[in-house]
């Protein structure tokens, strides 16, 4: 049976959800449509009982944009979609982060959500529709799921908030924020803004949440009509005697350890020792208490002998101890108060050959950030369903295993690295100079050397500092901070600059980046229900104070961008040439432009309008390239003196001289010197660079070719060496 539900969200935005037509063998499948953009989402969850040793939810979310959806061919030799693009990975992460908290605690069945974009009108982006479709697919399935979830994008054009703005509307929007949530609460945020205030952000979130409520209700109605019963699920129940024993065995030790302000490695070692000792004692205790007959009569008692289950119980007490310490005493694992930011150190120019660099250290989190400046040719070509463009500002984030003291594989860039890099990039992009002001392609690379929380925000701070060190004229400096939340009933505490443990054991990870004038990017993940706007307002205000503190430290290190680019950065010079001369500069098969590059070391880029951009790390190379190009397009004029190169010597005739690139003229034997010349080779040889004057231009009546008559005698100077042929002419 095909069931379709439709809703009008206002502003001409109509969304429909359909189930029962496609992918009927999946546990759940829906098609969501807005305009002519359509996505199909499917979900399948394994019915195989997971191992009792499993302690994570193996949820896989895949988002794919099919090129046929927009009537396009994929690029590359094979002409088919291959590995996911960065856009697809980021969209999948958005959906995953919103869905994951809504599955029941302890549900560890392998689950796969696949979202395919099957039609694109190239105006309505499909990413947030994918989140809606995924939630709806789970709702109409038999898979346990707490609440319907919906995702929307909020923009603002001319002061008016818009739900799911089109690509054209986003061009004029000062907000681009994706929001995921249920009818009761927000569980995910991510977006970029043009320095908006905290109050404006809250207004945008509230506006988006109203649309989310309507979409969640639509899903509930759809699921009600499908009326598919949820499969039975009972989470693993830990025996009460095990919980009691573990509490008595380790709670006091964990509490004592929590109140010690220790370094990350020391704390990890001492925590590991408590775990090992408690597991050993518990197994000894229950092995003696339970004989074979008791285990046979009650198989659940075997859980008391399971090392993994015991460690999970210890972990729950460790989590509770840390949370109560924060809520009751306002103290944190490293001894800070709730709002205190860890010590910050900054070093600039640490990589001599980079075009800008910084080493940013905050507590036990450290980022080494380098900047590379390039030309338009270095821009990244990005092709998506909705547009094709050259990306000239990028930030890449690397998180090697040694940064957390581990051994690991070094493979392709992971989803987490792509997501963190994108957030840092969006944070800084808003203050980057425009192409007219700064026509460089900019690549920032953040190498995380140490990590104990908030490495993406360290990348924002380090990236800003590296750009300023490199002389990139940022509009304003940007800093970022990660906020945390501990909530128990009505009690809550907001934490500034969270540690890795506080992120892991807490209820929220809220990253905020911005300038002194407003927020430029944010990302939030919530692990609990019931986050109200009052808490969010407090978190934003506290984040603002933290950002300003970090900005103070950054401005102490470097108050403004350096006035000069780095020594090894390319210098860009732009000149305008006639459009009809472009082919002359490029040459046959690019021969001429390649020879200029080889000769001068400069990189040359030519636009269709005749703008020639020359990039070279030395002023000499730039000057030489400009002179060659000007000489190339120069029209020979009688009476003008040129610096040319002898190409051929004919003893009884004269010398052929290349006086402008690719153009030769003849210095007749009688025009070489005021003295009588009997043998040209006595005076000139191939390769000599000489000054000549153009004395005549005439057409050969037999061939129709233009002949150029040159004179050394008219210049009245001896041959000179060291000046390239084709230098800019000297007017007589």
From Swiss-Prot:
Domain KH, residue spans: 570-629
GO MF, one annotated term: polyribonucleotide nucleotidyltransferase activity
A GO CC annotation given for this chain: cytosol
Record-linked SUPFAM superfamilies: Eukaryotic type KH-domain (KH-domain type I), Nucleic acid-binding proteins, Ribonuclease PH domain 2-like, Ribosomal protein S5 domain 2-like
CC cofactor: Mg(2+)
Domain of life per record: Bacteria
Residue sites binding Mg(2+) per the record: 503, 509
Domain S1 motif, first and last residues per copy: 639-713
Recorded catalytic activity of this chain's protein: RNA(n+1) + phosphate = RNA(n) + a ribonucleoside 5'-diphosphate
Residues of the signal peptide: none
Main location: cytoplasm
Keywords carried by this UniProt record: Cytoplasm, Magnesium, Metal-binding, Nucleotidyltransferase, RNA-binding, Transferase
EC nos: 2.7.7.8
Subcellular location: Cytoplasm
InterPro entries to which the protein is assigned, alphabetical: ExoRNase_PH_dom1, ExoRNase_PH_dom2, ExoRNase_PH_dom2_sf, KH_dom, KH_dom_type_1, KH_dom_type_1_sf, NA-bd_OB-fold, PNPase
GO biological process: mRNA catabolic process; RNA processing
Similarity comment: family membership: Belongs to the polyribonucleotide nucleotidyltransferase family.
Function of the molecule: Involved in mRNA degradation. Catalyzes the phosphorolysis of single-stranded polyribonucleotides processively in the 3'- to 5'-direction.
Record's protein name: Polyribonucleotide nucleotidyltransferase
Organism: Chlorobium luteolum (strain DSM 273 / BCRC 81028 / 2530)
